[in-house]
């Protein structure tokens, strides 16, 4: 009898590790599936942002330069109104959710509405003033400013490789600018201000999303809502509203289509920016934007109509583009290695707990 009890006891002890091992395998499989889904969502968000960002630059350039629409402010105003209208209808139909307006909302959103307004208007002004290749190469400065913003606001650090590739992009931009025959001081000033505001906006969006107070739809809605009246007032007092009303192209169906698309794309780009920042990071969003700019650079050279070719400018553009590609590769590689290391640490901790 004693022998039988000993055998049963040994069998039970032998089964425990097997069960533990099975549970651990199931946990690893579940984590792997979740990680695959997360990577897919990250790529989807990044791709959505890249396509949206590409389309809005092309459409805005067509409206402001090809059709010579006189008011960048009114284009920005149209984008704000479209954003508020779409999200208001979405909330009424219960497709999206975000908190109702109360006296605490301005505090929760600040300073994002101001950054959003400045980012949008300076982006439109610089799109109008600069040819597409120089517009895109000067946007490389947004990566440098994003690094500073994330370092200050989010306490992030960056590797030597990242810093060197950013340096290469900036050098390329300086080389290209040194022989830009279509140089426009106003355009250069607007694009550099836009770079600073883009960096600050990306870092603050990440910070606000992490706090989970308003959510991505709330941030989009209130950013646009709070800046409609100030933008309308500025457009009225500067005479931009009058110029827009007197514009002769309103009878052109193709112009109307592109103007409407520009307004709607403003909302889509805002949503894509927040989505990409939420699933990835402010820096990744900036990287995707710069990769998109590579395509715009070459398209702008051939089809833009306002690019003046010089070898120095062309070489500078390509130095900056090469830096962008290497930078993107290093950043994504480092991010994946970091996440893999974190996942392995979690598995090790769970494995020890199971044993």
From Swiss-Prot:
Membrane-related topology note: Multi-pass membrane protein
Keywords per UniProt: Disease variant, Dwarfism, Endoplasmic reticulum, Membrane, Sugar transport, Transmembrane, Transmembrane helix, Transport
Transmembrane segments: 37-59, 69-88, 158-177, 187-205, 217-239, 254-276, 281-303, 308-330
Tissue: Ubiquitous.
Cross-referenced InterPro entries: Sugar_P_trans_dom (IPR004853), TPT_transporter (IPR050186)
Entries under Pfam families matching the protein: TPT
Effect of residue 65 to P: In SHNKND; loss of transporter activity
Family: Belongs to the TPT transporter family. SLC35D subfamily.
Function, as annotated: Antiporter that transports nucleotide sugars across the endoplasmic reticulum (ER) membrane in exchange for either their cognate nucleoside monophosphate or another nucleotide sugar. Transports various UDP-sugars including UDP-N-acetyl-alpha-D-glucosamine (UDP-GlcNAc), UDP-N-acetyl-alpha-D-galactosamine (UDP-GalNAc) and UDP-alpha-D-glucuronate (UDP-GlcA), which are used by ER glucosyltransferases as sugar donors for the synthesis of sugar chains of glycoproteins, glycolipids and oligosaccharides.
Protein name in UniProt: Nucleotide sugar transporter SLC35D1
The organism of origin for this protein: Homo sapiens (Human)
Lineage start: Eukaryota, Metazoa, Chordata, Craniata, Vertebrata
